[in-house]
UniProtKB/Swiss-Prot annotation:
Residues 253-311 are annotated as: Disordered. Keywords: DNA-binding, Plasmid, Transcription, Transcription regulation. One of its GO terms (molecular function) is DNA binding. This is Protein KlcB. The lineage of its organism: Bacteria, Pseudomonadati, Pseudomonadota, Gammaproteobacteria, Enterobacterales. The keyword Transcription regulation applies.
Amino acid sequence: MAKRTKQPAQTGQDWSAPAAELLAELPADRDGLLAAAVAAVVEIDAAVMRGDGAAAELAGDRYEAIIWKLNGGTNFGCMADDEAAGRVIERHCAAVPGDVPLWGQRGQFLAVAGDVRALVEYEAGYGGPLNAHFQFHAVDLDRPFISATGYRSHFDTARGCMTVDEVARGILTAMLAEKKRPVLIEANYRDRLADAPLPDWLAGLVPPARREPATVTIPPGFVLVDVVLPAHKAFIARRWAAEAAGKVKAARAARSNAKGKAGGRERDPASAETAMRCSTAKADDCKAEAGPVSPEATMPGAGEASCSTARNGDAGPADLVEFTPAPGQRCEIVSVHHPVFAKEIGKRVIIVKVHPDTRQVWAHDDRPVTYKTNRAGRRVVDSDPSCIQSIYGFDQLRLIT
């Protein structure tokens, strides 16, 4: 459900300026704009849950128009720092940490796939609130994960008739399934992550998060001792060990806090102080009509079409149609996840591999193989585009028929 491409601006017109009719509907004061942003987020989520692509885009345009107006009539610098208009609105509309956010609403929550638990940070991706950026952080450092670093980033789009946590859980499950063998977090990353505390809302997690480092570091004033004792004396050693473990944990926490203060304020993707309690306004249109949904049905790509949108060539209103890419198909790039790659729009590619669970394809440039003559006078390959492949999302491509 990616945002449609804007029409080219006329000469002298600001290409990023919202439509005049959208601006006319917006309040003039700051408090009114912040309230309108919360309402826009709720509308975005309700439209996505209904599978209504056109309504979701309209609400997304309104959200972006609010940022444009609060930023002084321009998009330039709207996400530059914590006090920029885009960041202020993002924090104001953020979900309560631990609650599943709405589509277009920044937040943190827990995703579980089998024995793997991940702290998920969700935010709107580049290009508007209908684009999605998921960040997966390992909770249990001694268990397999989707990355040897304990972290994985994934760009996607809003999925019709699916909640944010359903999509995140499906992505996590798909990434685990594509691993041929369990991937353990490497020792150096595990040691570093062990010093990074989890958010407070995970303090009551059951069972508790396993955050022990791979390398045992003994703080000054402590000594690691391996000892074999008779049973009647072992209880004393156990009591000493328990007391020492508490002191070691406190020493590590103090050292971690000191590092945080020295490095400046840590990033808080969804601060509880500025969070709006609009995460309870979840639309239940799809679930109410369809009844209980099985875990398999919530997986991305499960069953029939998942209400995803494919764009018309003229960038007209969104239609809920199924785009099923297959190897060998020729496609045109219609959108990118970051403006720096805007020059790629319009390029034609050939699909090599399809991953339906994560809604991604591997493709190479649609160019012929070129040859040259080497010093021995033989004709050899000069450039083979199939040797360089890139990953694209389903919504970034348009099938060329």
